[in-house]
């Protein structure tokens, strides 16, 4: 999912399309190989500026811009 000027809208769209437990491909950075994992929470807005989600086996939250549904 790409960055969005309105993170609340990004979170709402993500949560309506992808329930908790959805498999995603996560990239730590753009050149990294994707890691297949699953969401463990609904997406949330972090610090009023970034849409994030928590993933199984990953420490901390991850920006939705680093995740693609599998």
Where do the PLM segments sit?
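Mixed-charge, Lys/Arg-rich low-complexity intrinsically disordered regions
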Residues: 1-20, 30
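Basic/aromatic-rich interaction segments and small domains that mediate binding to polyanionic partners
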Residues: 23-69
